Amino acid sequence: MEDLKPRPASSSPLTPLGFLERAATVYGDCTSVVYDAVSYTWSQTHRRCLCLASSIASLGIENGHVVSVLAPNVPQMYELHFAVPMAGAILNAVNLRLDARTISILLHHSESKLIFVDHLSRDLILEAIALFPKQAPVPRLVFMADESESGNSSELGKEFFCSYKDLIDRGDPDFKWVMPKSEWDPMILNYTSGTTSSPKGVVHCHRGIFIMTVDSLIDWGVPKQPVYLWTLPMFHANGWSYPWGMAAVGGTNICLRKFDSEIIYDMIKRHGVTHMCGAPVVLNMLSNAPGSEPLKTTVQIMTAGAPPPSAVLFRTESLGFAVSHGYGLTETAGLVVSCAWKKEWNHLPATERARLKSRQGVGTVMQTKIDVVDPVTGAAVKRDGSTLGEVVLRGGSVMLGYLKDPEGTAKSMTADGWFYTGDVGVMHPDGYLEIKDRSKDVIISGGENLSSVEVESILYSHPDILEAAVVARPDEFWGETPCAFVSLKKGLTKKPTEKEIVEYCRSKLPRYMVPKTVVFKEELPKTSTGKVQKFILRDMARGMGSATAGASRSRM
């Protein structure tokens, strides 16, 4: 069979862009996008994306050029996930909650040629552009009015080249979109959140995004024509690749500019939402919403981004949400590990089910392999649920590498074929992975490795605590000790004291894991996707000095 080799008919490049054309054929008259009073069908979305792609190409945007977008979860943001790569360009969705200085650095680093800007981010982008180096080329700006309002190109300032509507109106609906020459061609550029360090440019190819999109649908068991609520920002790892996934299954995208628990519950009731995604902070918001009542119909919710406390999972599911839990990174374009549920677990007590579901799980069906290894030797750690190691993985959705950072790429993607995530975890005897911390968040107290996540889980079980995060505080004797930052629920008649919270932890944790310090905050600092920015809290803890300077050295 040596003569049987790949041929053009069997090696068409894998790309998720074809999902849109199929959606227009199969689900043409079905609703694709809803945003306030605005709605489109899949035929209309397909036509709009072709017009937009043709206009982008007519501006001199070539294969490999970066096109950026600064916008929330509005219809234009959804359309650009197709239109930009359909023009042969690389989509760069920018976190709109970043400050102007950081945005300026990212845009300059990416050499972005064109930037689509939501009308509420006008001042932000102009400030960012003003911070460009003097000799640096400035990208052209496209103004995006809110489609639910009467905004048009007359609102444009001289800084903007044209409006989004202009590009749609003058585009060619018969445009032949640019098929990648190779499935390995770059399609997406995302920057990491910067929760632990400076953001890095992560490049994904058409093949990787295709694999992640299909994998996400299979693993979550997404049916045809779901109603999907956009609570997860599309600028965060491209919404875990669900923009393309919703086209593949002909779903309805319910777009939201912003949300809170009241808006979410209203959207669920109004549109019959079946699916949504969000970080554990969204689950915490929903489960603590004033006057929340159990849902009349089940809503599937996928959570990831941080290890969810089992207490939060328990409260959320008691309201009628069916929670699925996964794990992924910007570098994997979405979730590559999920807590695959076993039927026999249904018969366990609710608290035990929540504990099992809080584990990250096993590799998804299209993820080649995951493991937990000793970061020094590279050997797999014991599958005992307690031996810590670094989480490593390999698979088709892992990034091509970091933009303009060969050293960083080589450090994380080693010669032995593994991608080193920087996350610390354990492997349980049943083969399920559990994330314990980021490597920078592990607390080493008296020579013991201490998981901040385990302490946080206990804090979240306290009836008065809304949010909790634990970091290391310097200690002259122990090296480091746990320092807890908490925010309390609203409307408490009696607020717990630091001593009471410490006593609560002492009743449920080994002595060395009990926080020596509890700091009360109105709200914890978070990224736009709900991840607590622990580097800010670590700086605060360091500023407190030693926890036991001149004090008792005994373990609590």
Swiss-Prot record:
What are the annotated disulfide bridges? none
Q: Can you state which reaction this protein catalyses?
A: 2-methylpropanoate + ATP + CoA = 2-methylpropanoyl-CoA + AMP + diphosphate; propanoate + ATP + CoA = propanoyl-CoA + AMP + diphosphate; butanoate + ATP + CoA = butanoyl-CoA + AMP + diphosphate; 2-methylbutanoate + ATP + CoA = 2-methylbutanoyl-CoA + AMP + diphosphate
Recorded hits in InterPro entries, A to Z, give:
AMP-bd_C, AMP-bd_C_sf, AMP-binding_CS, AMP-dep_synth/lig_dom, ANL_N_sf
Instruction: Tell me the protein's name.
Output: 2-methylpropanoate--CoA ligase CCL4
Question: Does ATP-binding count among this protein's keywords?
Answer: yes
This protein's UniProt keywords: ATP-binding, Cytoplasm, Ligase, Nucleotide-binding
Cellular component GO terms, alphabetical = cytosol
UniProt entry tagged with the keyword Transcription regulation: no
Q: In which tissues is it expressed?
A: Mostly expressed in old leaves and in cones and glandular trichomes (lupulin glands) after flowering, and, to a lower extent, in stems, young leaves and flowers.
Q: What is the lineage of its organism?
A: Eukaryota, Viridiplantae, Streptophyta, Embryophyta, Tracheophyta
Q: Any idea which GO molecular function terms this record carries?
A: 2-methylbutanoate-CoA ligase activity; ATP binding; CoA-ligase activity; medium-chain fatty acid-CoA ligase activity; propionate-CoA ligase activity
Q: Which family does it belong to?
A: Belongs to the ATP-dependent AMP-binding enzyme family.
Q: Which Gene3D superfamilies match?
A: 3.30.300.30, N-terminal domain of ligase-like (3.40.50.12780)
Q: In which pathway does it act?
A: Secondary metabolite biosynthesis
Q: Where is this region: SBD1?
A: 260-325
**Subcellular location field:** Cytoplasm, Cytosol
Q: Which residues does the annotated region (SBD2) include?
A: 326-402
Residues that coordinate or bind ATP: 192-200, 325-330, 423, 435-438, 531
Tell me which EC number(s) this protein carries: 6.2.1.-, 6.2.1.17
Q: What is known of its domains?
A: Both substrate-binding domains (SBD1 and SBD2) are involved in the substrate recognition, and are sufficient to confer the substrate specificity.
